[in-house]
């Protein structure tokens, strides 16, 4: 690059490229549950795809539109709103953003979801029954979300305060040193690039980060919550401060390896380096692994950010969405926005990301946020939510098996973020009641031309609330009623004929009496 982008260009580029990397890499991430077997990799543009969602009991295929991002960018925007809110950002993020995120999360990791559920119950992860899991949570869920702190600190240049904030943010959901150090190392790298006023030389970034280990690698006990003392008396797996030191040393060793590899120039092999960085191992989702991979790719492809992001997004076997997101954040901070192709500017919530950059850089974030929010109000019916005013764009349904459905409400925030809220419902017969003992008149095309049946609603309600009743379809219920109304009284024969439990037939017969 011949020109150094402005601070605003850098910060806007970092937010946009983070979302772009996330959206490019998400379909190919090993945990994405992509059901499109023939999806071609490496084309360099956004794609529509389907993901298997809902787990065992609410299984459904969810359509992901081209350019839509995952939890990585969702968390970046959640942290941004927390900083903009005007309240204590740690409290806002913990008790507003995280619990609400459970309604719209896309691809969130276990540590994040567990922490969010814990805060929803008005508890903290380090004091909960899952405290052991919390202190073993070393994933990249903390690293991926800390970019807004760097942007909000852009004009203050207070590196120590930045590190304090990133440390404080990380421990809200992750307790293992790998997660926290991954976040502080990433923030330090972003901050170095943000304030670099000369062209970054090949490999220079790696050496600057190595030299800064006493800043990003320091355990910041002074910012710990007063009740965050479990780390001193952990009775499982590791001694905390020893593990902190070991993880710091491991990151430095890997950075030295990257530096040595980069000196090979054109002979350096991406696969070899990423393998050494553990990107293909079971620990490939760790916070330190993600940031090390991103630092390598940004250092190697500094003059070709498009290729660098593609490499992160399309390398089979690595954590493609998060590594591409972090790589994108570094490239955006380095190169600004001018390099971003037109097709990549179709990323979900492009305008929102630009707005967030403007707000985080402003002297009065709350006032700037209000000005932008007010300009986006166009006669919508606004509704309140824990994260501010929203409006509904549309509502649609997705089937989940034979007896369930997912109601998806697409909403928008006033800053322009799109969220898909999910509501899970069992599909039941459309029978309404107002009194517990009221009889309901039911008709069926075959039998009701000459007959009428009366159901005792109290009995029918009792039957339908039985968990086993959910296994029988409405069609089978009608067939049972047909046979009973035609004079068949042998419940055993009806059950065998229709392959249902005899107790269900008897229950329906009893409700008809």
Provide a role label for each language-model segment:
Residues 493-495:
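Short alpha-helical "recognition helix" segments of helix-turn-helix
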Residues 1-479, 502, 507-513:
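Structured, active/binding-site neighborhoods that engage oxygen-rich ligands
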Residues 482-484:
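Short alpha-helical segment immediately N-terminal to, or the first helix within
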Residues 488-489:
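Residue-level signal for the short linker/turn that defines the boundary of a DNA-recognition helix
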